[in-house]
A protein has these predicted regions:
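Short, contiguous, well-structured surface segments enriched in hydrophobic/aromatic residues
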Residues: 162-168
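Conserved acetyl-CoA-binding loop-helix of GNAT-fold acetyltransferases
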Residues: 191-204
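A solvent-exposed, charged loop/short amphipathic helix patch at secondary-structure junctions
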Residues: 170-190
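Terminal substrate-recognition subdomain of acyl/acetyltransferases
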Residues: 1-134, 142-147, 155-160, 172, ...
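Short amphipathic alpha-helical segments, especially helix-boundary/capping motifs
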Residues: 111-113, 176-181, 198-199, 219
């Protein structure tokens, strides 16, 4: 079964029969052979965490990390495999209500319509973020993704860590003038808090609630797009500078050279540091954030029955029970 999955992955992850596609297939097969001990251990861990049915629902995307970059351009294949395996072990063992496997699955974590019509916070794992994290926290306005943060969880030296691999705004299919108008209106609705900043605060709340000890965000120089896998020119097309975004939100250097450390504490300004004419707005903003935090904490682990499941996730609890005992906790990134 495991060998069949690996063979299938070569044809699925690198489709087509052009010279380039055949070359990519050969490169992937070579990487699989080189990393076979680590890949074999990885698939055993994934099967123990998810069960055979769960692993089938997840698909073969996870095997692709033996070849392509993941979260950071600096990570080698063994580290990439380790983090993916740890992510699913953590969720399956500790937070099964947040375990998303299929690319069409999503969880509505928090309705924000009382603050801005049609807005909500949604957790999902769309295919285009497959190299930047296993989960994506999004701010939606109706069906439009206004802002997204892709991340993975893993356990390192006994502590739970969260690694952010991407931050994204409204897609390029929406013209810039319309996008700016949406951002402007939402910033007004959120009491002067930009949509991306609201999303970062929501992710920090999620991290605190799950017991995350360290929150890391990939540096701009180490974004996965800058890996040689994509060629020499791909990195030149990137618009947003991640370093600027993270530093605006209190980031500092971390013990991982390719990641910043973000503070877990919620942002809060002392009243004496706020101009008098803006204090009322900041008080309303704090009420908004407190409401969002309370809503998130109410539906995160311990209250899984409150989560609104979408797509075809099915009954996570039943599937986990059928998969056997929970896997042991394994340290990553040693």
């Amino acid at each position: 079964m495991m060998l069949g999955t690996i063979v299938k992955s070569v044809f699925t992850l690198q489709p087509g029969y052009s010279l380039r596609a055949l070359n990519n297939k050969c490169r992937l097969a070579l990487q699989i052979a080189r990393q076979w001990p680590e890949l074999n251990a990885f698939l055993q861990r994934m099967t123990a965490a998810l069960g055979q049915q769960g692993l089938q629902r997840l698909g073969v995307d996870c095997i692709g990390v033996v070849q392509w970059p993941y979260l950071s351009k600096c990570w080698e294949a063994p580290q990439r495999l380790e983090v993916v395996a740890s992510h699913f072990e953590v969720l399956a063992g500790q937070f099964p209500a947040l375990l998303l496997l299929g690319r069409d699955e999503s969880l509505t974590l928090c309705e924000l319509s009382s603050h801005s019509p049609g807005c909500r916070l949604v957790l999902d794992r769309p295919i285009w973020f497959k190299r930047e994290g296993e989960l994506v926290l999004n701010l939606f306005q109706s069906d439009l993704r206004v802002a997204s943060l892709a991340f993975s969880l893993c356990r390192s030296q006994g502590e739970l860590c969260l690694f952010i691999g991407a931050v994204q705004g409204i897609h390029k299919g929406i013209d810039s003038e319309t996008s700016l108008a949406i951002y402007r209106d939402l910033t007004k609705d959120f009491e002067g808090l930009r949509p991306r900043s609201l999303l970062i605060e929501a992710l920090k709340c999620l991290a605190r609630t799950l017991g995350v000890a360290h929150l890391y965000a990939v540096s701009d120089a180490c974004r996965h797009h800058r890996h040689a896998y994509f060629g020499n020119d791909k990195g030149h097309d990137l618009a947003a500078n991640y370093d600027v975004i993270w530093l605006e939100h209190g980031a500092t250097a971390s013990n991982h050279a390719d990641f910043f450390a973000l503070p877990l504490a919620a942002v809060q300004r002392a009243e004496q540091d706020i101009p008098a004419k803006k204090r009322a707005m900041y008080r309303r903003r704090q009420v908004l954030l407190d409401d969002v935090f309370a809503r998130l904490q109410a539906v995160l682990p311990g209250s899984g029955h409150n989560l609104e499941l979408q797509g075809e996730q099915g009954d996570v609890s039943d599937e986990m029970a059928s998969a056997g005992p929970r896997p042991p906790v394994v340290d990553s990134l040693k």
